[in-house]
Structures are given as structure tokens and as C-alpha cells.
């Protein structure tokens, strides 16, 4: 009506009905930053930190059962037996004879051409393959308590006799090999060590960032403590002899102890724990790769280098045997050095670390954004800016550095606890299936014998992987709330 009371206009009604931005999101929501309007400028609002507004979901861990793991001495013995079987198979593939020919044929008396085999080379390879077993025996004998001086003297004498015997056989085989072979062939004897040491030196000296030194809460014994304290000095240049001594000591060391996880609450402690675990995992993977390649080299490749030019052998089958030995040795060493308890430790640390997803510029322009702070625990779904980029929190508990690629890689590998176990199971299962297929199509007696012997060893490894996968799959699928655990 013309003379009546006018109500509020549409524009005034819309403005009064909508709450303010500060009421919706609580102001800046953390770390002295503000929201952004449509023009991109920041609105300076004072508000409590984001952890006071949104509580991050607490990290809960599953309890996994204690799965049996082979002891260090037992594993080294089984691994040595497997390598000897693989070496015997390679010699069969190279020096087999046609023993079913008539007896007047020159190569019909035995199944192998024993007169062509270099026994000095076979003894040298055996000594090189037994290095870990010998050191495991010495380490186990050193840890046994001595009740009397007689017992202690007997242990010292046994260690000296064992080391003297191995050293004498090693020197005796080297002298005979130097007499009977050319220099080019002799270079293949120490090729793995000649390649490993420069690569190890380059890897250690090329580190640009020192590892954290406050990793004492991760270790359980002095052996691991010494290794953790020494990791901080990797960036300092050292002479070649010290690197060589350290590299050789790593090759003779037994299985390292598994670190512990203390569920730290401070973001700095979580990142330091991740750095220490990352260095420990890289050291274990380096040991797995080198020892598997070392074993395959001396078992399947080195005998081929000393075959006479007039000797015929199946090159394709010998190379296939080389690949099978390397894959199975890799899986065996991985199951020993990366047991389920250790993988669960990495999974727990990755759950505390979290992950950030990088977003495109212009996306989420109207959503609240914050400046990333290293002292803040960020909940899931929060948008932060770091190094001129926009990131979104993926994990329920995020303390990782958004621009740190190693943190994202660590979370990707270990946030699923069964990822490594599934990978090893797929590799070993594929190898066993291929060997069964090759066994069905085998027509030569040496092919059938070699596949059957290797399969007998692979079945044991496959059984352990399947057992761990079934048990851990049930354990991780069990509801965490039923444990009655307190969140960390």
C-alpha cells in the first residue's frame, strides 16, 4: 500500500538471513591466516587454531599375532642349502652329457662331463656363498654365555679354526684359479664387490640432507643404536677404507633388530620417526637387492664365464635359471628382513604421518585456506598453502610436509599394511605357476630335474607367504573397536 509500512527489501533480507563467514568456519581457522574472498584477498580474522575447531580423528592400531619367524642361523642355513642346490642345477645344465648312448661313445659313462668341471671354481663359489652362514655361526657362538674358562676357550678355538679353514680354502682356490685362467676371467670373481663399494660410497656421499639424530626411541639394542647414531654422519666425507670396512661389515651382519614404535604425539617426533624408519627400510632393501644379485651372480652367472669356448650348453635355459634364482633369493631375503611385525611398524608410522594431495590453481577458491604449519596436526579435508601451492589433507591425521615427495612415497607404500606382503606373494606365486607350466612342457631330463628341485625350495617360501597373508588378512579385517584400545 502507498501509505503502509514497508517491509525489508530483498537485498536487506538476504543479507540479514545469512550468517557471517566468521560464524561458519570460525574465522581464520588456524595459524594466523584468514579466509579468501572472491578477489583472492585475505580477510584478516582472529580465531582459534584449527585443531581447536576440528579435532583430528585419533589413530588406532590393530594388534597382529606373533607369527613364527626363522632364526638368523636357521635362515642362513636354509638359504645356503638353496644356493647349493641352485649351483648344482646350473652345473647340470652346463655339463650334462648324453649318458644313454652306447658305451663305445666317449660321453656315455656318466650323466655329467666331470672332467670339464673346474673344482677350484666350485670351491671358490661355495666359500663365497657360505660367508653369511659362517658369520652367523660365529655371531651365535659369541652370544652364548660361558659358564667356565674351558667352555670359553673351546668357543674361541672353534671360531679360529672355522675362520682359518675358510681363509685357507679361499686362498687355495684363488691361487689355482690365477694359475689356470686368464686375467679377464679372474676379473669376474670380485666383480660384485667392485661394483657395490663405489655405488655405496656415491650413495652415501651424495646425501644433501642429514638424517635426524634424535632417533634413540626407535632402537632396542646397542647394535641398532650404533647404526642409528652413525646415520647422522653419512653426509660427512670419509676415506675409501672406512667405507669399504663399513660395507663389508654390513654384508656380514646378521638380521638387524626390529625398531619399536612409541606413537609420538608431536609432529616433529613423528617426522623424525619416519626419517629414521625410511633410512632403516632403505638399508634393508639395499641389503636384499645386493645379496640376491650377489647370490644369483655366483650361482648362475659365474660358472658360465669359465666355460670353455668348445663347450656347448643351452644359453636360454641357463639365463632363465639365473632369473629364477635371483627372484627367489630376493623373496626369501625380503621375507626375512621385512617380516610382518616390521611392516606393521611402518604402517603405524605412515598412519601418523598422513598425506597431502596437490590441487590445481583456481580450485576451491571460495573454501577456507590456511598456511601450513609444522607444529599443527591437520585433520582430513583441510586445505593448506605451502610453497605457493594448494594441498588437501588426505589422511585422517596429517603432519607430513606437503612438498616432501619422500613423505608421500612413504605413505603410499605403507598406509596399507599388506601391500608389501601382497607384492611378494604375487611375485612368488607367479614364479611357481611359471615353473609348473615349464615342468609340464619339459622334454629334457635336466630341465625336469632342475625345475623339480627348485620347486621344492619355492614351495616352502610360498607356504610362509600364504600363511602370513591369511593370518594378517583376518587380523587387519577385524574391527578395531572390538579390541578395546585407546586411541593414540
Curated annotation (Swiss-Prot):
The transmembrane residues are 72-92, 110-130, 155-175, 182-202, 287-307, 319-339, 420-440, 446-466
**Which residue positions carry a glycan here?**
31, 39, 180
What is the membrane topology noted in the UniProt record heading this document?
Multi-pass membrane protein
**Gene Ontology terms: cellular component:** endoplasmic reticulum membrane
In the record, biological process GO terms are:
autophagy; negative regulation of autophagosome assembly; negative regulation of autophagosome maturation
**Subcellular localization(s) per the UniProt record:** Endoplasmic reticulum membrane
Q: Which domain of life is it from?
A: Eukaryota
> Which UniProt keywords are listed?
Autophagy, Endoplasmic reticulum, Glycoprotein, Membrane, Transmembrane, Transmembrane helix
Q: Does the keyword Oxidoreductase apply?
A: no
Name the protein family.
Belongs to the TMEM39 family.
Functionally, this protein is described as follows: Regulates autophagy by controlling the spatial distribution and levels of the intracellular phosphatidylinositol 4-phosphate (PtdIns(4)P) pools. Modulates (PtdIns(4)P) levels by regulating the ER-to-Golgi trafficking of the phosphatidylinositide phosphatase SACM1L.
Name this polypeptide is given: Transmembrane protein 39A
Amino acid at each position: 500500500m502507498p501509505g503502509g509500512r514497508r517491509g525489508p527489501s530483498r537485498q536487506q533480507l538476504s543479507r540479514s538471513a545469512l550468517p557471517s563467514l566468521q560464524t561458519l568456519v570460525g574465522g581464520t581457522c588456524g595459524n594466523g591466516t584468514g579466509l579468501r574472498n572472491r578477489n583472492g584477498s585475505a580477510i584478516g580474522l582472529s580465531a582459534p587454531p584449527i585443531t581447536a575447531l576440528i579435532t583430528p580423528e585419533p589413530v588406532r592400531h590393530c594388534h597382529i599375532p606373533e607369527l613364527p619367524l626363522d632364526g638368523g642361523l636357521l635362515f642362513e642355513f636354509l638359504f645356503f642349502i638353496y644356493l647349493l642346490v641352485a649351483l648344482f642345477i646350473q652345473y647340470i645344465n652346463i655339463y650334462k652329457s648324453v649318458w644313454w648312448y652306447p658305451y663305445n661313445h666317449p660321453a656315455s659313462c656318466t650323466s655329467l662331463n666331470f672332467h670339464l668341471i673346474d673344482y677350484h671354481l666350485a670351491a671358490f663359489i661355495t666359500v663365497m656363498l657360505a660367508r653369511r652362514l659362517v658369520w652367523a655361526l660365529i655371531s651365535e657362538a659369541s652370544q652364548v654365555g660361558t659358564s667356565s674358562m674351558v667352555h670359553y676357550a673351546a668357543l674361541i678355538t672353534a671360531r679360529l679354526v672355522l675362520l682359518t679353514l675358510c681363509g685357507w680354502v679361499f686362498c687355495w682356490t684363488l691361487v689355482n684359479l690365477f694359475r689356470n685362467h686368464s686375467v679377464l676371467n679372474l676379473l669376474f670373481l670380485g666383480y660384485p664387490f667392485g661394483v657395490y663399494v663405489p655405488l655405496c660410497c656415491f650413495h652415501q656421499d651424495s646425501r644433501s640432507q642429514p638424517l635426524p639424530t634424535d632417533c634413540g626411541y626407535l632402537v632396542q639394542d646397542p647394535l641398532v643404536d650404533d647404526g642409528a647414531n652413525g646415520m647422522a654422519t653419512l653426509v660427512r666425507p670419509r676415506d675409501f677404507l672406512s667405507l669399504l670396512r663399513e660395507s663389508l661389515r654390513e654384508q656380514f651382519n646378521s638380521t638387524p633388530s626390529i625398531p619399536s614404535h612409541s606413537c609420538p604425539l608431536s609432529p616433529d617426533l613423528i617426522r623424525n620417526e619416519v626419517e629414521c624408519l625410511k633410512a632403516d627400510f632403505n638399508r634393508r632393501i639395499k641389503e636384499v637387492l645386493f645379496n640376491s644379485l650377489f647370490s644369483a651372480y655366483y650361482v648362475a652367472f659365474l660358472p658360465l664365464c669359465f666355460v670353455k669356448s668348445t663347450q656347448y650348453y643351452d644359453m636360454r635355459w641357463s639365463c632363465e635359471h639365473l632369473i629364477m634364482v635371483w627372484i627367489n633369493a630376493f623373496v626369501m631375503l625380503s621375507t626375512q628382513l621385512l617380516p610382518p611385525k616390521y611392516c606393521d611398524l611402518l604402517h603405524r608410522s605412515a598412519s601418523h604421518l598422513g598425506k597431502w594431495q596437490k590441487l590445481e590453481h583456481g580450485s576451491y577458491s571460495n573454501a577456507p585456506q590456511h598456511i601450513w604449519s609444522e607444529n599443527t596436526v591437520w585433520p582430513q579435508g583441510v586445505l593448506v598453502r605451502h610453497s605457493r601451492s594448494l594441498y588437501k589433507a588426505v589422511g585422517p591425521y596429517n603432519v607430513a610436509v606437503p612438498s616432501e615427495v619422500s613423505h608421500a612415497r612413504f605413505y603410499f607404500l605403507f598406509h596399507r599394511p599388506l601391500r608389501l606382503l601382497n607384492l611378494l606373494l604375487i611375485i612368488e606365486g607367479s614364479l611357481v605357476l611359471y615353473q609348473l607350466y615349464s615342468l609340464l612342457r619339459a622334454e629334457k631330463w635336466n630341465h625336469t630335474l632342475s625345475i623339480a628341485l627348485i620347486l621344492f625350495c619355492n614351495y616352502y617360501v610360498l607356504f610362509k607367504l600364504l600363511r602370513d597373508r591369511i593370518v594378517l588378512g583376518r587380523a587387519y579385517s577385524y574391527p578395531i573397536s572390538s579390541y578395546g584400545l585407546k586411541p593414540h
